[in-house]
Amino acid sequence: MKLYKICNKISLLLHVLASAAGYFVMEAICRHSFIEAWNYMTQRPLVFAYNAAFIFTSSLIVYLFHRRVFWRVLVTLFWLILAIINGVLLLNRVTPFTGPDLHLITDAMKIANKYLPVAGVVAVCILFGILVILLLMLLIKGPKYQKKIKYRYNIPLILLAVALFAGSTQLALEKRVLSNYFGNIAFAYEDYGYPYCLATTIFNTGISCPRDYSEKEIKRIEKTEKNLPETQEEKRPNILFLQLESFFDPTLVNYLDISEDPIPTFRKLMKEYSSGYYKVPSVGAGTANTEFESITGMSMHYFGPGEYPYKSILRETTCESAPYVLKNLGYTTHAVHNNEANFYGRRSIFPNLGFDTFTSEEYMARENEKNPNGWVKDEVLTDEILKCLDSTEGPDYVYTISVQGHGAYPDEQILEDPEITVSGAPTEEENNKWEYYVNEIHEMDNFVKELTDKLADYPEDVVLVMYGDHLPTMGLTVEDLKNKYLFQTEYVMWDNFGLKKKNENLAAYQMAAEV
């Protein structure tokens, strides 16, 4: 009892120490290393102190309740669970846990069985249930602060602490101890700490109004557009975009030894048609953002860190895009995806992007043709693309999103007689993942050949842009790649009417205008 009284007297000091210790544990979990957490703390002490102060400020809520032990445990669990979520995610992908991921919970639940065994999902549910029961018991039976709570002092002091923390945030931004622009979100989390970065991705969303935005400025811009040459009324080709899931050239990985070229068709097309590197906004995940840039011509740099427009602003409003522009030129616009219509909310998002039709796996005759991982094979897309082209007499814009190359990739040998063998990965498990992945993209490459062969004989002019949406979820680093860049794949612009070849590296948001 005497110890309890002493702890109450120095509780603020204990909160400070506990916040610092707790934050250190959080970073150790997120970085998968106590040594890395120690290096971060000693090399960036001001950032560490700021994030510890963040946790300390959030813990001050306990002084408004008698059940202080319960609230301390609850706050601790809140931060600890967030750290565990991030730590687990970083075992499976390169990008850390962000605010927009909270909007993807329903999508995550749908594909959880592809990343976790059923027993794992059940175990998580059981542990969560036990935790809730223990918290309820602590709330009802736990220790209780016996003295009267002085709200007239506690509330103003807590508000003062929040105000001081807000002021320190602004000061840290001005002094560049922190930054609210994340060029690479994975590196930002390492540099600025998990609590700050997570909060930034939750609250810093959308596009800020430009400083010089006004009616006068818009009229000035309109005047500069009046002397542009009129659009020529000539024959317009069909425009096809094919976004290949996690597709890239695995021979760019330094340590892999691959028995044969897994993407001979794509490589041949790159030599014969316009091609180059394709800069994308994400790595290991984030298909929808590469898709957004390619469709709208807008860079994700203008949005909040880690934001998914598909899960934010596009739920509420329309957006200028290639489909809308092309519809004004007489095109009919189609979207095709061999996965569920609701994944990333596409069923409700695509109308806001200007698509006239959307064909998802539920409406495909061959939806049961799946790979060992449970994803619909890409070869089913050939017929669906041709159906879109045949459905109208005029020109068509068809944006197709493939899914076959999606993770997670099995770390066990599940291909009995793989067409292509892989060696050189650091562990047997990683080698199994790469071998599975390489054989999947080889099948995707065969699909590319089938599609281009069919389109070569199509009676109308066709331009087909093909590219990977991001690198696969393999934990790749810059040092692992010959091209030394994680945020790029490759593209090829194929056609059946003799366009001049042009080699150029492009960003995803530039491609629609380039076509």
Predicted regions and their residues:
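Secondary-structure junction/capping motif
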Residues: S33, T98, V177-I202, D249, ...
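Membrane-interface segments at or immediately adjacent to transmembrane helices
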Residues: S168-F241
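Short secondary-structure junctions and interdomain/linker hinges
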Residues: R68, V88, Y115-A119, C209, ...
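Solvent-exposed soluble domains appended to multi-pass membrane proteins
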Residues: E225-E234, L244, D249-V515
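Transmembrane and membrane-interface helices of multi-pass
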Residues: M1-Y189
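Residue-level preference for non-acidic, small/hydrophobic
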Residues: A108, I239-L244
